[in-house]
Amino acid sequence: MVSSATICSLLLLSMLWMDMAMAGSSFLSPEHQKAQQRKESKKPPAKLQPRALEGWLHPEDRGQAEEAEEELEIRFNAPFDVGIKLSGAQYQQHGRALGKFLQDILWEEVKEAPANK
C-alpha cells in the first residue's frame, strides 16, 4: 500500500501546482483589469505642451527655456504608453513620417474595433 508520506507529498505538490496555475491565470482575470484601471485613474492627465511655449506661458521660466534647446514632447496612451522627444530640427526633418506612422497605427485600431464587436 502507498505510504502516508507519499500521499502527503503528492497532496502538497498538487496544491503548489494549483497555486502556480492560479497565478498564471490572474493576468487575464477581470479583477486584474479593474485593479489596473483604478491605478491608471489615479494618475493625473499628462500635459501636452511644447517646451518652447513653456517660457511664453510662464515668464518666470523664460531663462530656462531659452537655455535649453527647443524640444517637442509627444505622449499618448493606448494599451501602452508612448513618449517621444524631438528637437525642433528633428521634428522638421521627421515630422511628416512620424505623423503618418501615428495615423496608420491609430487608423488600424479604428478599423479593428468594429470588427471585434
From Swiss-Prot:
Lipidated residue numbers (O-hexanoyl serine): 26
Positions of the propeptide segment: 52-75, 99-117
Domain of life according to the entry: Eukaryota
Biased composition range(s): Basic and acidic residues: 31-43
Residue numbers spanned by region Disordered: 28-68
Lipid attachment in record (O-octanoyl serine): 26
Pfam families with a match to the protein in the record: Motilin_assoc (PF04643), Motilin_ghrelin (PF04644)
Expression sites (tissue/organ): Ghrelin is broadly expressed with higher expression in the stomach. Very low levels are detected in the hypothalamus, heart, lung, pancreas, intestine and adipose tissue. Obestatin is most highly expressed in jejunum, and also found in duodenum, stomach, pituitary, ileum, liver, hypothalamus and heart. Expressed in low levels in pancreas, cerebellum, cerebrum, kidney, testis, ovary colon and lung.
Cysteine disulfide links: none
Any one GO CC term of the record: extracellular space
Intracellular or extracellular location(s): Secreted
Post-translational modification: O-octanoylated by GOAT/MBOAT4. O-octanoylation is essential for ghrelin activity. The replacement of Ser-26 by aromatic tryptophan preserves ghrelin activity.
Keyword Acyltransferase in record: no
Keyword annotations from UniProtKB, A to Z: Amidation, Hormone, Lipoprotein, Secreted, Signal
Name of the featured protein: Appetite-regulating hormone
